[in-house]
Regions:
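Sec-dependent N-terminal signal peptides
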Residues: 4-12
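Boundary at the C-terminal end of the N-terminal hydrophobic targeting segment
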Residues: 16-18
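Acidic/His/Gly-enriched intrinsically disordered linker/tail segments
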Residues: 133, 137, 153-233, 242-299
Length: 300
């Protein structure tokens, strides 16, 4: 069986650092519980990638967590300053990222920011229940940190002679992160653990079957947004992982950093050109039998 798959009071959050752990910044209110929440999730996610895929990050990673989106950027700026870095992008839109979401999250070089709805009371029950929701999402965002690290993409690189970012395509970046988020849910949390390979494939295929978005649509940086986009990207990366093994999703970014060429990296790892895979994906995304054969390596 394949198992898959009051503002001034909060403004100066206390950082928490540990060996082989992310640098945690969170609010002063309920600081111990929030730090424990983030630290436990960080440890579990790092162990998941190290134990299952031999993937580790030695460079510092900032992990910001808050229940107040209004001060998310203050935490982040303090964390970056402590690390001797500066924010290279526009401030994060905390309201958009966090508002009315059980867990909101985003990643960039070299940080992950997370937020959650403020509960009536902070206690151990809150920590445990929130941790169950937060950890898989952290696995998704930590995948992005691995992608940056493997590709040597901090600061972000450009494709030679263009203004386009080297790291990509967007569906590969987000689809891979979605795959490892799902794997964490299955392998660590036991979600859908009894599903066989066929059921897992069917479940992953369903959102892509409904979406009209193509992989070409999801190639530009930042194009993978919304359920349909994420579902399509997830299935595209999932097929590659089923066909070549999940480790191949990491190998692509490693070779991308060496070759500085998306096409070379993709063909070297998966034995197909991007163009060929885009064509194959359209052929199999709504055909379960064809998708099964492709995932098994029985068809090109």
């Amino acid at each position: 069986m394949l198992r898959w798959l009051v503002l001034a009071f909060w403004l100066t959050g206390t950082p928490s650092f540990g060996q082989n752990a992310s640098r945690i910044y969170t609010d002063l209110q309920a600081n111990a519980l929030k730090t424990a929440l983030l630290s436990e999730a960080d440890n579990k996610v790092r162990a998941f990638f190290a134990d299952q895929f031999d993937q580790r990050i030695t460079a510092p990673v900032i992990l910001v967590g808050t229940s107040d989106p209004d001060i998310l950027n203050e935490h982040l700026m303090k964390a970056l300053t402590d690390l001797g870095r500066r924010q290279r992008t526009s401030p994060i839109d905390g309201a958009k990222l966090c508002d009315n979401k059980k867990i909101g999250a985003a990643a960039n070089r070299p940080y992950i920011v997370m937020c959650w709805l403020k509960p009536k009371v902070y206690d151990d029950r809150w920590r445990v229940l929130t941790g169950q929701k937060l950890a898989p999402i952290l696995a998704h965002e930590f995948t992005h940190q691995l992608q940056y690290d493997l590709a040597g993409d901090d600061p972000a690189q450009r494709i030679a002679g263009t203004k386009k970012l080297l790291l990509g395509p967007s569906w590969m970046i987000e689809g891979s992160a979605e795959v490892f988020e799902q794997m964490y849910k299955v392998q660590i949390q036991g979600k859908d653990v009894d599903d066989d390979a066929a059921q897992s494939l069917f479940n992953m295929q369903s959102p892509a079957r409904r979406s009209r978005l193509t992989l070409s649509d999801l190639t530009p940086t930042g194009s993978t947004k919304g359920r349909g986009a994420y579902g399509t990207a997830r299935f595209a990366a999932y097929l590659l992982a089923r066909r070549n093994g999940p480790q191949a999703l990491f190998q692509y970014f490693e070779i991308l950093g060496q070759a500085k060429d998306r096409d070379i990296a993709f063909e070297q790892v998966f034995g197909l050109t991007f163009k060929a895979y885009e064509t194959n994906f359209e052929r199999v995304r709504r055909d379960f039998a064809a998708a099964t054969e492709f995932a098994a390596g029985e068809t090109q």
